[in-house]
């Protein structure tokens, strides 16, 4: 019985934290959609403890405005954030800083401790 209790405690401790998210409504981007390119690789750690990297040269299309910033969807590829579940994620940038993610399947915003992102604006 004691071994079963220890196994149960270890199992519960091994579960990942849920990705923090709050409801969010995407609004039209002022000035219309644009594309940016990340000019320098960005590495960061999510609140759940998982690491992610946004590659230099990756391109992102502005999809909408949130109170926290502008949501950018990857032009080619998919970005995910992970906790207890894996979520498709779009970057949310505010003034050259990555401030979180828009989770399109959940219509939600997930905040991040801000990280500086160097970008080049591309018109397409």
Where does each model-flagged region fall?
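Positively charged n-region of N-terminal signal peptides that target proteins for export
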Residues: 1-5
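C-terminal motif of bacterial Sec signal peptides marking the signal peptidase cleavage site
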Residues: 11-14
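Bacterial signal peptide processing site
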Residues: 16-19
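Alpha-helical transmembrane signal-anchor/signal-peptide segments
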Residues: 21-32
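Residue-level detector of solvent-exposed, low-hydrophobicity positions
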Residues: 22, 51, 57, 67, ...
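Mature extracytoplasmic domains of secretory-pathway proteins
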Residues: 31-95
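C-terminal partner/receptor-binding element of secreted or periplasmic proteins
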Residues: 95-124
